[in-house]
Structures are given as structure tokens and as C-alpha cells.
């Protein structure tokens, strides 16, 4: 990694990250990349995960973007990716930023459209995964305690 002048903002896949952050921490600012995936990217590209991302060169940024574009070509295992066996295409891929947001929104809309249990729960804003609802997930205003008015003394 050749040293060059420090950049306060580094643009990686349509996202500006803080140049003062370490490489692993800066990658986690991108939606769809967690700590473990960021460390895996650093290991695959032989980058120091504790180095500041403001000092890496443009070639390293392009390599990071290439890994994010197709992680399996660089040896990242299939179980590490966040979209396995896609509903429409059957592909296994890793989604980030707006692609991830659109896919999640489409998945929710599909569940609502086919009227599945999870889709119905999402529609009415109730918990989906079987949590209790007697005391939690309450919406609306609370009813306060009424006080008796003091009699005129």
C-alpha cells in the first residue's frame, strides 16, 4: 500500500466514508457490510484493517469495489453473502446500499401481496416473529389517572 496524501472523505460504491476511520470500520458505514464482512475484505485484499482509510490509494479503493461487486471471485464463501438463492433469479449475491433497500422493500411487498402471515403482520405494524403483544408494541396515547378535584375549603 503506497502512502499518499490524506483524504478526509473517501468515496466507495456511491458512499462517502470518513477518512479518519480504520478500513474495517469505514467499510461498515456502507449498508449491507458488517464487521465480519469488512474484515474478510481486508484479509482477501491483504490490507491492514487498522490503517486509516484516508491514506489508501485509488487502486485499493477500486479493488475494494471489485470485491463488493463479486465477492465469490475473490474467495469469500457463499455462506458469507447476504442474499442467497434469490427468489426471482436463484442467484447468490451480496447486496449493498440502495440495491439492498429495494430488494428488502420488494420482499415485504411480495409477502403483503400474497397475504402471508408475515405480510399481514407487517401491514398492520405488529411484531412478526412471535413476540408477546399484551404489554409491549403498544401504540397510541396512554390513558392517565384522573384526579379528584379538591372540594372548596
From Swiss-Prot:
Located at the top of the head of the 30S subunit, it contacts several helices of the 16S rRNA. In the 70S ribosome it contacts the 23S rRNA (bridge B1a) and protein L5 of the 50S subunit (bridge B1b), connecting the 2 subunits; these bridges are implicated in subunit movement. HAMAP family: Ribosomal_uS13 (MF_01315). This is Small ribosomal subunit protein uS13. GO terms for biological process: translation. GO terms for cellular component: cytosol; small ribosomal subunit. It comes from Methanosphaera stadtmanae (strain ATCC 43021 / DSM 3091 / JCM 11832 / MCB-3). Residues 129-153 are annotated as: Disordered. Residues 143-153 have a biased composition (Polar residues). One of its GO terms (molecular function) is rRNA binding. Belongs to the universal ribosomal protein uS13 family. The lineage of its organism: Archaea, Methanobacteriati, Methanobacteriota, Methanomada group, Methanobacteria. Keywords: Ribonucleoprotein, Ribosomal protein, RNA-binding, rRNA-binding. The keyword rRNA processing does not apply. Part of the 30S ribosomal subunit. Forms a loose heterodimer with protein S19. Forms two bridges to the 50S subunit in the 70S ribosome.
Amino acid at each position: 500500500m503506497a502512502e499518499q496524501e490524506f483524504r478526509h472523505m473517501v468515496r466507495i460504491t456511491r458512499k462517502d466514508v470518513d477518512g479518519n476511520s480504520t478500513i474495517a470500520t469505514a467499510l461498515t458505514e456502507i449498508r449491507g457490510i458488517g464487521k465480519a464482512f469488512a474484515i474478510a475484505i481486508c484479509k482477501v485484499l491483504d490490507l491492514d484493517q487498522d490503517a486509516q482509510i484516508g491514506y489508501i490509494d485509488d487502486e485499493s479503493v477500486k479493488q475494494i469495489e471489485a470485491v463488493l461487486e463479486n465477492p465469490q471471485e475473490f474467495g469469500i464463501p457463499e455462506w458469507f453473502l447476504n442474499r442467497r438463492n434469490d427468489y426471482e433469479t436463484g442467484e447468490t449475491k451480496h447486496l449493498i446500499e440502495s440495491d439492498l433497500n429495494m430488494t428488502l422493500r420488494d420482499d415485504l411487498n411480495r409477502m403483503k401481496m400474497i397475504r402471508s402471515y408475515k405480510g399481514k403482520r407487517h401491514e398492520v405494524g405488529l411484531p412478526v416473529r412471535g413476540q408477546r403483544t399484551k404489554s409491549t408494541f403498544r401504540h397510541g396515547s396512554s390513558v392517565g389517572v384522573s384526579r379528584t378535584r379538591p372540594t372548596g375549603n
